[in-house]
């Protein structure tokens, strides 16, 4: 029986291994992690991550051929294939701080694999890693291997949170990169055979190691670039009276461009886009390509600009001050159908409003109060380092209350900001909300999900990103 072990029970490792276990009943899959609480959650009814469809998959396989354990060494020792799905956060200090990936967790995983292995193994990079990581890992493994042979493969994930299970069941492509030696090709074939149990052969692509590593960074950079492109257009639309939804629809009907990732918003978030682009920028700089680095940096600059532009619009619209005004924040996760708040634009928007002394009342159907308070009191890039290195009791941000209901959040508020496109926000009773808000009542729709004309009929002053401005907003001072 082939045995697979995955180090790291997070957003990537957990769902990926659960689906492999479901689709390959003859393979024994173990997901290991040093976090006792995380493994306990995977073994309970309350999984540590929210992902539609994940519950069902885990329940079908857990205890049969899918196991979650803190006994890392035992399962690595037994495995034929070891997936490494540990965090690769952005470095917060030292060489390349703020851009380079921190490979501390990766390196310690590699050293541990070398230590405990008594038989040849295939080691698979699953986390997003900088190009040439495989080479570094290979050196660590071979120098500590005591005669055991390791083959390194790169098998980047292309999951979107909120649709991870669907993406795993029916992927656009599975990418496997390996060495161009006979041993390397044999390792690629072994992993290919696992995926081939449910993925059509033509969707399994094989490349060399570097191409596979770079493809992941490039894919995320291209996606983020599309969002920044449409967000840049949204600023121009507001200035000229064009409607960004009409513009992006017209552009998206061009079959060479296509309609996906062309929704203007308050900005992109998530654990990968910014991190991967910074990483790409760093790799370009290290390879003496400053023009290329500058090009990709601009994607992040536009994203930061879009978030600060939103905050400025809120403050400018409300008579240039939000001091001690209650503002309702609807949505805190970086997108709908996930509880993930990593790099969510909501953090920067909330911090911007708090900087102007606003009182915030926040509601998100999937994010806990503890998480929101932690996010708002954290330094940049801290979120990606393990919780035990973060402040233990997050200092409660005084002017923030977290509530469990949209109507509670908006009661007596001067304005409301929609920062996540949860479906439930489309069907709220906005008349009821209007009646319970201070007047004039403002809606700042950071996701373009509400019908602005209907809200104006109720009496709201509405700002939608990239849409012709409400006459009221035109009188306000221009946004700096």
UniProtKB/Swiss-Prot annotation:
Residues carrying Phosphoserine: 393
Top enzyme class: oxidoreductase
UniProt xrefs under InterPro entries: 6-PGluconate_DH-like_C_sf, NAD(P)-bd_dom_sf, UDP-Glc/GDP-Man, UDP-Glc/GDP-Man_DH_C, UDP-Glc/GDP-Man_DH_C_sf, UDP-Glc/GDP-Man_DH_dimer, UDP-Glc/GDP-Man_DH_N, UDPglc_DH_euk
Binding of substrate, residues: 157-161, 216-223, 256-269, 334-335, 447
Keyword NAD part of the UniProt annotation: yes
Swiss-Prot/TrEMBL keywords: NAD, Oxidoreductase, Phosphoprotein
A Gene Ontology term for the protein's cellular component: nucleus
The protein's Enzyme Commission number: 1.1.1.22
PANTHER family: UDP-GLUCOSE 6-DEHYDROGENASE 2, UDP-GLUCOSE DEHYDROGENASE/UDP-MANNAC DEHYDROGENASE
Role summary: Involved in the biosynthesis of UDP-glucuronic acid (UDP-GlcA), providing nucleotide sugars for cell-wall polymers.
The name this protein goes by in its record: UDP-glucose 6-dehydrogenase 1
């Amino acid at each position: 029986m082939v045995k697979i072990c995955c180090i790291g029970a997070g957003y990537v490792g957990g769902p990926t291994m659960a689906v492999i276990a479901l689709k390959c009943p003859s393979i024994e899959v173990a997901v290991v992690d040093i976090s006792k609480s995380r493994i306990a959650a995977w073994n309970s009814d309350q999984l540590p991550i929210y992902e539609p469809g994940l519950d069902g998959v885990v329940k079908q396989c857990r205890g049969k051929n899918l196991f979650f354990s803190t006994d890392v060494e035992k399962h690595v020792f037994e495995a034929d294939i070891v997936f490494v799905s540990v965090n690769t956060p952005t470095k917060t200090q030292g060489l390349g701080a703020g851009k380079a990936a921190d490979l501390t967790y990766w390196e310690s995983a590699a050293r541990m694999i070398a230590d405990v292995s008594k038989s040849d193994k295939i080691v698979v990079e699953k986390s997003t890693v900088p190009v040439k990581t495989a080479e570094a890992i290979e050196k660590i493994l071979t120098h500590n291997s005591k005669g055991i042979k390791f083959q390194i493969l790169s098998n980047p994930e292309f999951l979107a949170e909120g649709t991870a299970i669907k993406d795993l069941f029916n992927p656009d492509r599975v990418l496997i990169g390996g060495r161009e030696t006979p041993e390397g090709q044999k390792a690629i074939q072994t992993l290919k055979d696992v995926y081939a149990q449910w993925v059509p052969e033509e969707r399994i692509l094989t490349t060399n190691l570097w191409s596979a590593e770079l493809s992941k960074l490039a894919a995320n950079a291209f996606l983020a670039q599309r969002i920044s492109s449409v967000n840049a257009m949204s600023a121009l639309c507001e200035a000229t009276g064009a409607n960004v939804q009409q513009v992006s629809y017209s552009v998206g009907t061009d079959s060479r461009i296509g309609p996906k990732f062309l929704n203007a918003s308050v900005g992109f978030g998530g654990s990968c886009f910014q991190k991967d682009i910074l990483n790409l920028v760093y790799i370009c700089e290290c390879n003496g390509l400053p023009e290329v680095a500058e090009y990709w940096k601009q994607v992040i600059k536009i994203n930061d600009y879009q978030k600060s532009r939103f905050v400025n619009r809120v403050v400018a619209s409300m008579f240039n001050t939000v001091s001690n005004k209650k503002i309702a924040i609807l949505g805190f996760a970086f997108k709908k159908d996930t509880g993930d708040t990593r790099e969510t634009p909501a953090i920067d928007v909330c911090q911007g409003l708090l900087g102007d002394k606003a009182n915030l009342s926040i509601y998100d159907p999937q994010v806990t109060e503890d998480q929101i308070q932690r996010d708002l009191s954290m330094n940049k890039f801290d979120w990606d380092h393990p919780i035990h290195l973060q402040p233990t009791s997050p200092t409660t941000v005084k002017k923030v209350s977290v509530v469990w209901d949209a109507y509670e959040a908006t009661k007596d508020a001067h304005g409301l900001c929609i920062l996540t496109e949860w479906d439930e926000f489309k069907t709220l009773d906005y008349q009821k909300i209007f009646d319970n808000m201070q007047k004039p009542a403002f809606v700042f729709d950071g996701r373009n999900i509400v019908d602005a004309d209907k809200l104006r009929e109720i009496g709201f002053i509405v700002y939608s990103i990239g849409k012709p401005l409400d006459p009221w907003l035109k009188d306000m001072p221009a946004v700096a």
